[in-house]
Regions:
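RNA pseudouridine synthases
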Residues: 1-205
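Long, low-complexity, intrinsically disordered segments
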Residues: 209-213
Length: 213
């Protein structure tokens, strides 16, 4: 099993072929490893951690919402989140007539604000409207979900970066540590063992899990 961790830049599709007439790039411009595919997608205008694997069962385990793997995002928004808005995100908001699953949300301030490289192109900035960073953890992945959730509470998303994936095995989360934009690395021997255990679980039962720490 071949498995990689990629820091996907802005403007790149989560696939290895370009779409005809599209302005977006593709993964082949950054990864030259054959026979690996994204286990869970990031929209072209989103950035961050993307796991690529040659194993179809691992793809299923990490993307099926029944298994409840927490994904954590850093979200730059227009406006300032108060506790009421954060609680709305935690409790769930209605998207396309369906309530989102309970989430984890907190306002990132001071040293907690992620030290990220500048985005290309840069995020739009308006002097009259402050921006803030939220950390949001979800256990499902509906289309444009993070953007729709923040918009529903009056905090439009400006920049979206997936920071980590929780394998729900009690070990550390897979994360962006030491991965610059556009760079990838193979999983470590220990990470590979954990992923192998994940797909070797013959019980095949969905996991309820617990919020990331």
């Amino acid at each position: 099993m071949t498995t990689l961790l990629l820091h996907k830049p802005y403007g790149v599709l989560s696939q290895f072929t370009r779409e005809s007439g599209s302005r977006w790039g593709c993964l082949a411009e950054f990864v030259d490893v054959p026979d690996v595919y994204a286990a869970g997608r990031l929209d072209a205008d989103s950035e961050g951690l993307l796991l690529l694997t040659s194993n179809g069962r691992l793809q299923q385990q990490l993307t099926d919402p029944r298994f409840g793997h927490w994904r954590t995002y850093w979200v730059q928004v227009e406006g300032v989140p108060d506790e009421q808005r954060l609680q709305q995100l935690r409790d769930g908001v209605v998207i396309q007539e369906k309530l989102t699953r309970p989430a984890q949300a907190r306002w990132l301030q001071g040293d907690a604000i992620p030290a990220l490289e500048e985005r290309t192109p840069p995020v739009r900035w308006r002097a009259s409207i402050p921006t803030s960073w939220i950390e949001l953890s979800l256990r499902e992945g509906r289309n444009r979900q993070v953007r729709r959730m923040t918009a529903a509470v009056g905090l439009p998303t400006l920049r979206l970066v997936r920071s980590s994936i929780d394998l729900m095995d009690g070990g550390p989360r897979l994360n962006l540590e030491e991965l610059a934009q556009g760079c990838w690395r193979p999983t470590t021997a220990e990470e590979q063992k954990r992923l192998t255990r994940l797909i070797s679980d013959r019980r095949g039962r969905p996991r309820d899990g617990s919020p990331p720490g």
